[in-house]
Structure formats: C-alpha cells, structure tokens
C-alpha cells in the first residue's frame, strides 16, 4: 500500500515494518510515523539495538535458543537437569516455559512444525540433532511441548515414532482447563482433552 506524499525512504521503512508479525500496512504506517516523530527518544536507540542484536545474537548450537553466547545461558547453566529434554516449536515457546518456571531440564527448539500445507518436511526442522541428543546416556525423558494444533500433534507423533528406539520415555504436556478458566467459555476440543487428562484429587 503506497503512502501519498511519502518518499522512498519512508516507503521502505513502512514496507519493512509491515513484514513483522501482527503489523499490516496501516499499523506499519502508524509505527513509522511514531518512530519518525521520536527520532532521538525512540528511533535511534531502536536502530542501535537492532544493529547490536543482528551482530551479537545467534542460535545456540545445542538447543536452538537465541542468545549472545553459544552454548546459550540455559544450556550452560550447571543446575539444569540433564535427564529431561523439553521439545518446543519456537524460541518464544522456550521463553514462555522459562517464565512459568515449571521445567528445570534442557530444551530443544525445532524451529517449526511439520506441515503438508506449508511444505515443511522433517529435514526442514531441527530433528536430527534432537535424535542425537536423546541417545545420550543421561537422557531419560523427552517432553513434547508442542502446540495443540493439527500440525503440532502430527509433529509430536512423528517424533515419538522417530525416537522409538532411543530408550527414553516420551511424554507430552497435559491438555485441558487453564488455571482460572470457566468451562462455559472453553471450546469442545479443550473440554474433551481435559476429560482425557483428568487425574485423581
């Protein structure tokens, strides 16, 4: 969407901003105008932070997390449990689990999920490294923390089959009622999963 009275530099800025998740042409235009109106307070510091991140941040060669160090701070932490590896789709999922503080083992970022529609195949994901890691002597459990989508569950089944001979326990996150959730507002699939995952009180 071309912006009237905007030069090529502004058009390029808007075009690049529009490529970010959740930003369409209108939102990108508003963001660009906001940045241009706050050059010293926001635009220049943001440009410096982006350049710094582009130069210094890389994917961890062990788990796939994003960090300035390799291995990342999570992999390098001596107090993490080596017996369990939690498999996630994205780095954002890893960060969400870390915020929750519920998992104390190691992580593995796949970099996506299998998808026939999007043409994502096993060789497009970080699966070979996962199989290598799961074969290590100290690993006894692989936790599949993938999204409850068709592609996520297809990927989980593929991984379970692929690692069947690795002599590890393969588990997945429980599905069901979220903390603070009301039954009347939950979808049918979530309610059905909650019943299947019910436990003794």
From Swiss-Prot:
The keyword Zinc is assigned to this record: yes
Keywords for this protein: DNA damage, DNA recombination, DNA repair, Metal-binding, Zinc, Zinc-finger
Protein's recorded name: Recombination protein RecR
Membrane-spanning residues: none
Domain of life per record: Bacteria
Zinc finger (C4-type): 60-75
Family annotation (InterPro entries): DNA_Rcmb_RecR (IPR000093), Rcmb_RecR (IPR023627), Rcmb_RecR_Znf (IPR015967), TOPRIM_dom (IPR006171), TOPRIM_RecR (IPR034137)
Primary role: May play a role in DNA repair. It seems to be involved in an RecBC-independent recombinational process of DNA repair. It may act with RecF and RecO.
NCBIfam families: recR
Domain Toprim: 83-178
Organism of origin: Maricaulis maris (strain MCS10) (Caulobacter maris)
């Amino acid at each position: 969407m071309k912006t009237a009275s905007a030069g090529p530099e502004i058009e390029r800025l808007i075009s690049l901003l529009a490529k970010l998740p959740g930003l369409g042409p209108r939102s990108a235009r508003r963001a660009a105008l906001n940045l241009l109106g706050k050059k010293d307070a926001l635009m220049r510091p943001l440009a410096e932070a982006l350049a710094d991140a582009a130069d210094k941040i890389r994917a961890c060669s062990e788990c796939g997390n994003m960090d300035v160090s390799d291995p990342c701070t999570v992999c390098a932490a001596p107090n993490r449990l080596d017996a369990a590896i939690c498999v996630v789709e994205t780095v954002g999922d890893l960060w969400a689990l870390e915020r929750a503080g519920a998992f104390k083992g190691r992580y593995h970022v796949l970099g996506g999920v299998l998808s026939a529609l999007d043409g994502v195949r096993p060789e497009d994901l970080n699966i070979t490294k996962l199989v290598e890691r799961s074969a290590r002597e100290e690993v006894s459990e692989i936790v599949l923390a993938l999204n409850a989508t068709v592609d996520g569950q297809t990927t989980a089944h593929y991984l379970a089959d692929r690692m069947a001979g690795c002599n590890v326990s393969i588990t997945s996150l429980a599905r069901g009622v979220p903390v603070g959730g009301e039954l009347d507002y939950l979808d049918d699939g979530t309610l059905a999963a909650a019943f299947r995952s019910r436990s003794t009180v």
